[in-house]
Amino acid sequence: MEVENAVIPTQEQMAGFLAPGPDGPISMVNLLKFKDKASYDDSRETELTGAEAYAIYSRGVMKTLAKVGGKLVFSGEVSRLMLGEVEELWDSVAIAQYPSRAAMLEMMQLPEYQEISVHRSAGLAGQLNIETANAVIF
């Protein structure tokens, strides 16, 4: 399995996201890798680390998640790899749940989400987003 971190989805990935999705809630598993130092597209000066810039984004996302009926299910720092092998570990894992794929898209289009997303881009070196559906409680 080849793993490639990204910050922006490809056209093919976006087309899949815009297609009709599963009925009901989805959960997005986010594997996050932060930059050592935040880097803003507008070249603003900053002393923030990537994790600090992403934390600004995260605080704003909590508000926009609630507006579309979503919620943060889990968030934690990666401490070690228990099984398998990767070249480099992610820094953090977060799982957000949305009422539907359409609700996630609605959130991404909110003006306040657009405003805070600059901190996401500034802080992330890469990310994997894994959509899950049909949650099962074991």
Segments predicted by a language model, with ranges:
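Short, Lys/Arg-rich amphipathic alpha-helical interaction segments
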Residues: 95-138
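Short S/T/G/P-rich N-terminal loop/turn motif that feeds into the first structured element of a domain
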Residues: 1-92, 99-103, 133-138
